[in-house]
Amino acid sequence: MLQTTLLALQGLSCMNCAQRVKAALESREDVHHAEVNVHYAKVTGEADTHALIETIKQTGYQATEAQTPDVELHLSGLSCGHCTETVRKALEAVSGVISADVTLESANVYGKADIQTLIAAVEQAGYHATQQGIDSPKTEPLTHSAQSQPESLAAAPNTVPATNVALATSTVSDTNTVLPTNTALPTNTTSTTSTADTASATSTAPVINPLPVTESVAQPAASEGESVQLLLTGMSCASCVSKVQNALQRVDGVQVARVNLAERSALVTGTQNNEALIAAVKNAGYGAEIIEDEGERRERQQQMSQASMKRFQWQAALGLLLGIPLMAWGLFGGSMTLTPETQTPWLIIGIITLLVMIFAGGHFYRNAWVSLKNGRATMDTLVALGTGAAWIYSITVNIWPDVFPMEARHLYYEASAMIIGLINLGHAMEQRARQRSSNALERLLDLAPPTAKLVTDDGEKVIPLADVQLGMILRLTTGDRVPVDGEIVQGEVWMDEAMLTGEPIPQQKSVGDIVHAGTQVQDGTVQFRASAIGSQTTLARIIKLVRQAQSSKPEIGKLADRISAVFVPTVVVIAIVAGLIWYFFGPQPQLVYTLVVATTVLIIACPCALGLATPMSIISGVGRAAEFGVLVRDADALQQASNLDTLVFDKTGTLTEGHPQVVAIHTFNGVSEQQALGWAAALETGSNHPLARAILQRAEGLTLATASQFRTLRGLGVSGEVDGIPLLLGNNRLLEEQQIDTRELQSLIQQQAESGATPVILTANGKPAALLSIRDPLREDSIGALQRLHQLGYSLVMLTGDNPITANAIAKEAGIDRVIAGVLPDGKADAIKQLQAAGHKVAMIGDGINDAPALAQADVGIAMGGGSDIAIETAAITLMRHSLYGVVDAVELSKATLRNMKQNLLGAFFYNALGIPIAAGILYPFTGTLLSPVVAGAAMALSSITVVSNANRLLRFKPKQ
């Protein structure tokens, strides 16, 4: 029974000692894997503890079973087995840790690691940890409910007021849909408390100010498990894919197994044992290995790919070296029919052909034999049967010619050699094309530099990327690529984030800003603190997401798989039936015609093209999308996105900038704009309210006076004195209660409200001094992107919790067709359902937090996120750059990918539907000739090359401007 044993080691002084112990342990047949450092050995296998200790003693060291952990942590926030597994992996990823035993409440850590680094690793995984016996302050959880309370716009310093959402009862156009207020409001609704509560003069109801909606970081469900990638060998066609996938799916703990023929890999998700996965693949007749380290796995995959290509090249050369001269001999007048004079030369050629078949085509026969033992048929079965039948017939004629009539003594040695040569040549060209299709993922992998510059007390030190730990201070200078995610603690830089987000314009970063692994410094120098390393970085998550998507299948691909599963047995039956028809009803010599027809049918059928049609398009399409900053979680999203007719947009943060700005200042009674802005900012100093921040942001650079006699006027605004001048700042009702004449302002107030802005009024000495127009403006590229989507034929809808007047104004400016306003997050999913019930194929575009229910309900969810956990985990498609042109790229690329997929599938089906009947001799009554097995072999190789080459066209895809 497979078990893991942890041993404490004594006497080791360096990693050479550790390697010696590791080699000794792994030399045992009952040890599958050993992980060793100078303190511990973690051994997986069937060996008992005593035997392992004796093995270590033989190397000159001592060992005992590890029982006392080096660090004990108290855990909180864990609720299931998936949580404990996540924390265990996070702890064991810390440098120096060899093993961690994790329960729902505690973790025993074995290894030499800093306690704070261990705690940080747990926090990074989304849970909480403190050292056993120490009551440390509990950090903020990643998943939380925002319990903000309503607050004045001019709140006291260090308070965070609630966000206000105005739901006015104004009449809107017929294109708007206003959901009833009583279905949209939470139960803890309170009255307005700040200047944000300004409503238009036409409003007849008090403005409602709901509390913020609960925000949460999307955590993977416990049932999702962890993903592991296997590198596979021996697969040749879609039948192999089906066999391996079924074998993996039957392993205990496996939830999802995705096998990729193009990449020769499998992505398995679940709680399975890795050794069991490898055993399952081997029992199915194929090879498999698991390499955890990304760099090592990539190197191994490249080595396997290069080795395969070289092997196919020399095998093709060997087959063609014999086949081409033989074929040329026959084409240019030489006799391919055996005579008594040529029996010996042809026998020598037959033996040479056999050697070529063994050395250049041995893999076909070995794989076919393994397939037969496992009760299945693959492409190798077809090749083995076809070439084997041709050679056996020829050698039989060669040895016993008298058994056959003269007209049946034609030899087909050249067919066996040429078929093997051509198919190997096709495999070599296909391998080269597949390498090109993986370039997008390779470029992502290349973004992470191999080293990092560590800042120490003794100066700067270059360390390997694998040695970077959480909390380390690292330095970046011009031209450097960022090794890990982190927060800038000193300096300022311009960052090129194009490869990560698709955004071509350099971004300025300074203290407090986050830098992401893989981005590049264009100018400047900074120091930053590592906050995410290894598989936790944004880049690593993107790579994982791309790999998962490339291994997934859309519905159209699953249809191809179902056909492929029965394809080869069907072809064998067709070959037998066709051969029998020619044997019993064909012209003389029937035996020759039977052999030619059966062999040609077997050779021309190409399940390989069918198996590659979908995965090659997916690999190219998903990879190209990643280069545009469009992350696809599942290939089925591409198929769904290609069928959309309606795009639904959230307003705040999607169509708009996401934060209010002062867009205009109107002054009265001789007050200057600068003076009015200074007074308003003085009253708002210390407030964190979004509208207060907008005023303070507009006043940056001004010298502000100190406000005195400050008062918060609930639901109205604020008052105070600046330089002895009494000031009021708030909504229209504030001025009415203070009996200040606002008749001259009413038309302007109405105009601002209708344009979607919030009018905030400032008075000085009892007279209007200024009206500040505050609104959340459209993003610079929103109008252009929406126009492009209109040109592509999409219906555009805005779905927002904002009031209808503001929503309608923004929609009119943006060019939105329809507005659904006054909807809180829990009602957005229902709005999507209504659109779907009307027969629309709907995509929801939102920020991935409050829009989560709608993103899940939509046919395709598209999250606008800068690579955050929330955005990546919520939607089927994530846009890494905050631009609506990413939506344009996503829908155009999805259409191009599905079109390419259909072309490949149609080509593969058409090729087989046309080729097999021709090979069976359907044209013989009209032409008097049969298709040569050699031509069939060339056609088979060409069909696979065509599919791969067509898929690679996606790598050059560019969205239309």
Swiss-Prot record:
Reaction(s) catalysed (UniProt annotation): Cu(+)(in) + ATP + H2O = Cu(+)(out) + ADP + phosphate + H(+)
PROSITE patterns per the UniProt record, alphabetical: ATPASE_E1_E2, HMA_1, HMA_2
GO BP: any one term: copper ion homeostasis
CDD domains: HMA, P-type_ATPase_Cu-like
Binding-site positions, Mg(2+): 847, 851
Residues that, per the record, bind Cu(+) 1: 14, 17
Keywords: ATP-binding, Cell membrane, Copper, Copper transport, Ion transport, Magnesium, Membrane, Metal-binding, Nucleotide-binding, Phosphoprotein, Repeat, Translocase, Transmembrane, Transmembrane helix, Transport
Domain of life from the UniProt record: Bacteria
Positions annotated to bind Cu(+) 3: 237, 240
Membrane-related topology note: Multi-pass membrane protein
GO-annotated cellular components: membrane; plasma membrane
EC number of this enzyme: 7.2.2.8
Amino-acid positions noted as binding Cu(+) 2 in the UniProt annotation, renumbered to this chain: 80, 83
Region entry Disordered, spans: 131-153, 178-201
TM region(s), chain numbering: 316-336, 345-365, 381-401, 565-585, 592-612, 860-880, 906-926, 928-948
Major place of residence: membrane
Keyword Transcription assigned: no
UniProt keyword Disulfide bond, yes or no: no
The HMA domain, residue ranges: 3-64, 69-130, 226-289
Residues at the catalytic site: 650
Stretches with biased composition (Polar residues): 142-151
Localization of this protein: Cell membrane
Gene3D superfamilies, per database record: 3.30.70.100, Calcium-transporting ATPase, cytoplasmic domain N (3.40.1110.10), Calcium-transporting ATPase, cytoplasmic transduction domain A (2.70.150.10), HAD superfamily/HAD-like (3.40.50.1000)
Function: Involved in copper export.
Protein name: Copper-exporting P-type ATPase
